[in-house]
Amino acid sequence: MLVLRSAALFVAAALFEIGGAWLVWQGVREHRGWLWIGAGVMALGVYGFVATLQPDAEFGRILAAYGGVFVAGSLAWGMVADGYRPDRWDVTGALICLAGMTVIMYAPRGGN
């Protein structure tokens, strides 16, 4: 159950961080305006809070593991929001990152 909660928090964090960055991108690069930028900044702030809800107490471990989720989530976001089509190397890289996240976050640790 702890792994499921942790994975759900990683997904929530990714939605807020990637979504927030995308909103800022839309506001600046696509000239959608300050409301988009403001919403993006708020979403990025929520991301920072969601990351603190992880059950593991180690900041470095949480953020390093989250990096794998961020990579895969960014590609998925691009597919859904912008019609981006990742190539086999994008997918391979994302899978490697997710494997690294799994090892960092969920490998058995004796006494830790």
UniProtKB/Swiss-Prot annotation:
* One Pfam short name: UPF0060
Assigned keywords, A-Z? Cell membrane, Membrane, Transmembrane, Transmembrane helix
Cellular component, GO annotation: plasma membrane
TM helices/strands, residue ranges = 8-28, 33-53, 62-82, 91-111
Localization recorded for this chain is: Cell membrane
Regarding protein family, the annotation reads: Belongs to the UPF0060 family.
- Protein origin, superkingdom: Bacteria
NCBIfam families, A to Z = PRK02237.1
Residue spans making up a coiled coil are: none
Membrane topology recorded in Swiss-Prot or TrEMBL: Multi-pass membrane protein
Concerning InterPro entries, the annotation shows: UPF0060
> What protein is this chain from?
UPF0060 membrane protein SAV_4756
The beginning of the lineage is: Bacteria, Bacillati, Actinomycetota, Actinomycetes, Kitasatosporales
The record's section on PANTHER family has: UPF0060 MEMBRANE PROTEIN YNFA
